[in-house]
Amino acid sequence: MTPGEVRRLYFIIRTFLSYGLDELIPKMRITLPLRLWRYSLFWMPNRHKDKPLGERLRLALQELGPVWIKFGQMLSTRRDLFPPHIADQLALLQDKVAPFDGKLAKQQIEAAMGGLPVEAWFDDFEIKPLASASIAQVHTARLKSNGKEVVIKVIRPDILPVIKADLKLIYRLARWVPRLLPDGRRLRPTEVVREYEKTLIDELNLLRESANAIQLRRNFEDSPMLYIPEVYPDYCSEGMMVMERIYGIPVSDVAALEKNGTNMKLLAERGVQVFFTQVFRDSFFHADMHPGNIFVSYEHPENPKYIGIDCGIVGSLNKEDKRYLAENFIAFFNRDYRKVAELHVDSGWVPPDTNVEEFEFAIRTVCEPIFEKPLAEISFGHVLLNLFNTARRFNMEVQPQLVLLQKTLLYVEGVGRQLYPQLDLWKTAKPFLESWIKDQVGIPALVRAFKEKAPFWVEKMPELPELVYDSLRQGKYLQHSVDKIARELQSNHVRQGQSRYFLGIGATLVLSGTFLLVSRPEWGLMPGWLMAGGLIAWFVGWRKTR
């Protein structure tokens, strides 16, 4: 480890211990060395004993920076895994991170706009940030060209070196996981960290986020379910992004939503529909849908519409991934656990020699209790834990390409639980998935595939006669080459047979001559002639092999 990495590791350990987070270490035999190690660091006491555990955890993650804040944001939606006092504190990480100096943000904006003062492009620039997040912060202004209200997002200064240092440490920890845990290799921790690194680094490029927001806005342009604010690409760069300012109710503010007369049941169902539409229709989904990035429009509360911001992290799935996921979901919904087991084997998620009958029974045991119950009565955290234990028995591997999807699904579940506890996630999603699968097979799918390929074949049609002629000529040449190779192989086979024959004769003659020379010296020159003949036969056999 470099000196910088050692200092960062020391800072992380000191931060956790100074906030008394060793309290989270379970009191088990396997953790005894870790707890003894903590006692040895007696000069790092808990300096915040007056604060509750939830607040201490939030402050520690906030102090450690964006990599840890993002982790806390994900955990904030898992209210079935944490008591309310911890989940409520983690939720504050979403939009209450300490801001950096607004004057420094103004300097960054001016540098991004070619050195001109902010007043040359914007009116009413607010030096005090509207919001501050782990990666960037937002200031309000008006476009000088048309007077529209906008928000200006700027990246935190000097954030990249800190992120890279933390990621290097996480990589080191990931490489130790297979050595420390019996099933650590199956978790593929290094690949998971690599995927996380990619998404985190991508989030630092606001040009990428601008493109993502434009794409999502296009996908839901006429949708009653989701609105994405307009981006002004002429003002965007890697370190700055300008987009329409929106007004809405934070999706986590249930009291305000109810006061506004929002149809909570429809809102919760639309959250599920938006997720599955992004994944299966568009193959392009917002992968950072924690409550701090989702609002609800004040208008038409009886027909509520989501507003999505912060599109820095998005995910996409190929056709194979989508089809596999959809068939798996439908099999779950239909309680066809045999199909689920077979799909896992066919996809390679579990080894091909897996006992399908045993796997089916294990899945049935874990999944059957979750059906026919409202969402509020189901502990999906415990279901995931049971599935993990089942996977361990059958050597199921974590699929890094689906980590973002899994995280987003957790966000959707958490938001759904807060908005409408009676929401049946499975019942809401099942019709959508059945319709999507039906659309992928049959005559309509064939017609659609033909339409997609038609321009290619129209372009290639004039070249078809020449392509056919070239194929026939190459086929004839290939056949000639095959015949030539076959003749050479046959010739080599004959030569090798002859070679083995002469080598065998030579060995026999040499051995015979040697035997006679030792046991029958009275035979005179005969042993010498036999040995000479053997050497000649050996030479002929050797020549045959060349």
Swiss-Prot record:
Compartments, as annotated in UniProt: Cell inner membrane
The keyword Kinase is annotated on this UniProt entry: yes
A Gene Ontology biological process term: ubiquinone biosynthetic process
EC number annotated for this UniProt entry: 2.7.-.-
Residues reported to bind ATP: 130-138, 153
Span of the signal peptide: none
Topology with respect to the bilayer: Multi-pass membrane protein
Entry's family note: Belongs to the ABC1 family. UbiB subfamily.
Keywords: ATP-binding, Cell inner membrane, Cell membrane, Kinase, Membrane, Nucleotide-binding, Transferase, Transmembrane, Transmembrane helix, Ubiquinone biosynthesis
Domain Protein kinase: 124-502
Gene: ubiB
Job of this protein: Is probably a protein kinase regulator of UbiI activity which is involved in aerobic coenzyme Q (ubiquinone) biosynthesis.
Residues forming the catalytic site: 288
Residues that span the membrane, as ranges: 501-521, 522-542
The protein's enzyme class: transferase
Disulfide bonds: none
One term of GO molecular function: ATP binding
Protein name (Swiss-Prot/TrEMBL): Probable protein kinase UbiB
Assigned GO CC terms: plasma membrane
